[in-house]
C-alpha cells in the first residue's frame, strides 16, 4: 500500500465552489489537491445554456464553463485527481481521507464542496428531456420560457417560489402537486393564489413527459390523478421539478453539525464548520441561493479562511517552541 499523501489543503468536489477554492488556494501557495468526485464539474455539466454567469455576453455551455474552471485551477498549480473520496475522518489531525482507488491523503485543512443534487421524479422521459425542457432551477432557466406555458412539480416552499418567479416570464404556470394542500409557508401560498397566471392541479403527479426529438423539446405532459388513477394530457413547453435537493453530506454525517434541512451548518458570514479546519462551500452548505456564482464566491471564502487557519496554526506552533 502506498504511503499517505500529505497536503495543506484538500478540496473535495469539482463544481464552481471546488474549482474557485482551488484557484485561490493555489495562488496562496498552499499547493491544494482537488479530488473531483463522481461527477467532475458538478451540476453545471448537465446544464446546457448558461446565461447568468458574469463575464460572458453570449450564452455559454455549462460543460464548457467547467472545463475552463478546471484548466484555470490546474494552470495556477492545483493538483487535480480523478478519484472519489469514500471516507473522511475528522477526529484525527491531520484529517484522513480515503479514496475509492485506495489512495490516502492526510490534510491539514479540508474544503468540502460536494454540492447538492436536485431530487428528480425518476421517469425515463424526464431523463430524456433534462436540459431540453426539463429543469430543476427556475432562476437558471426561467428566462428561456418567455410567453410560454410551464409546469412546476411540488408543494413546498421551493415549488411555490419557483412558480412565482416563473410568472415573470411564462404566460401560464401550472403547479402540479400530489396532495390536496401545500406545505409552503402561508405567505407564499397567499401570493400564489392571488397570481392570475398560476393554476394549481391537486392530487396529481407527472406520469410522462413528451415532446419532439429534433430539436429536442417538451410539448406536453401526461398527468395521473393519484386518487382516481385517471390520466389526462396537457400542453407544456417546460417542466420544472421542485421537490427539493439532497446535499451530499455523507462524508461528514455524524462528524459535523448539520442544519435541520440536512445542509452543513457554517458560522455566520463564514464557511467554517463545527470542526476547526474543515470548511464547507457551495450547495452542500447553501440551501437558499444554489447558483454557480454564489458557489464560486463561497469557494473563494473557504480558501481564504483555510489560508488564515493555517497561518494561525503556524504562528501558534512557532510561539510554543
Predicted regions: what is each one?
Residues 13, 36, 114, 154, ...:
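Short beta-strand/turn micro-motifs composed of small residues
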Residues 117, 122, 127-144, 243-289, ...:
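FAD-site-proximal beta/loop scaffold in flavoenzymes
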Residues 15-16, 39, 116-118, 157-158, ...:
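Residue-level detector of alpha-helix initiation sites
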Residues 2-76, 148, 160-186, 193, ...:
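Beta1-alpha1 glycine-rich phosphate/pyrophosphate-binding loop at the start
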Residues 80-143:
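Glycine/small-residue-rich loop that forms an oxyanion/phosphate-binding "nest" at active or ligand-binding sites
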Residues 73-99, 104-107, 168-268, 308-321:
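A Rossmann-like FAD-binding core segment of flavoenzymes
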Residues 160-162, 275, 281-321:
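A conserved FAD-binding loop/helix module that cradles the flavin
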Amino acid at each position: 500500500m502506498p504511503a499517505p499523501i500529505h497536503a495543506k489543503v484538500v478540496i473535495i468536489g469539482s463544481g464552481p465552489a471546488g474549482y474557485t477554492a482551488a484557484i485561490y488556494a493555489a495562488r496562496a501557495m498552499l499547493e491544494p489537491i482537488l479530488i473531483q468526485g463522481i461527477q467532475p464539474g458538478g451540476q453545471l455539466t448537465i446544464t446546457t445554456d448558461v446565461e447568468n454567469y458574469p463575464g460572458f455576453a453570449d450564452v455559454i455551455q455549462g460543460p464548457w464553463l467547467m472545463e475552463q474552471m478546471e484548466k484555470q485551477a490546474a494552470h495556477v498549480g492545483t493538483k487535480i485527481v480523478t478519484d472519489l473520496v469514500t471516507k473522511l475522518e475528522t477526529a484525527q489531525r491531520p484529517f484522513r481521507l480515503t479514496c475509492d482507488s485506495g489512495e490516502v491523503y492526510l490534510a491539514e485543512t479540508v474544503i468540502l464542496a460536494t454540492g447538492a443534487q436536485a431530487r428528480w421524479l425518476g421517469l425515463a422521459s424526464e431523463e430524456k428531456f433534462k436540459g431540453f425542457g426539463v429543469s430543476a432551477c427556475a432562476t437558471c432557466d426561467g428566462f428561456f420560457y418567455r410567453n410560454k406555458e410551464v409546469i412546476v412539480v411540488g408543494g413546498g416552499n421551493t415549488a411555490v417560489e419557483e412558480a412565482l418567479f416563473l410568472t415573470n416570464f411564462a404566460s401560464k404556470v401550472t403547479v402540479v402537486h400530489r396532495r390536496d394542500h401545500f406545505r409552503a409557508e402561508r405567505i407564499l401560498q397567499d401570493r400564489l393564489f392571488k397570481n392570475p397566471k398560476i393554476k394549481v392541479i391537486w392530487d396529481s403527479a407527472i406520469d410522462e413527459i413528451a415532446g419532439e426529438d429534433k430539436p429536442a423539446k417538451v410539448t406536453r405532459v401526461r398527468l395521473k390523478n393519484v386518487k382516481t388513477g385517471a390520466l389526462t394530457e396537457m400542453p407544456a413547453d417546460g417542466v420544472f421539478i421542485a421537490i427539493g435537493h439532497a446535499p451530499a453530506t455523507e462524508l461528514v454525517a455524524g462528524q459535523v453539525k448539520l442544519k435541520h434541512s440536512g445542509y452543513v451548518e457554517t458560522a455566520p458570514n463564514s464557511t467554517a464548520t463545527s470542526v476547526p479546519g474543515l470548511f464547507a462551500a457551495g450547495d452542500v452548505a447553501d440551501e437558499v441561493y444554489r447558483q454557480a456564482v454564489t458557489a464560486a464566491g463561497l469557494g473563494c471564502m473557504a480558501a481564504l479562511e483555510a489560508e488564515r487557519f493555517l497561518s494561525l496554526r503556524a504562528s501558534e506552533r512557532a510561539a510554543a517552541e
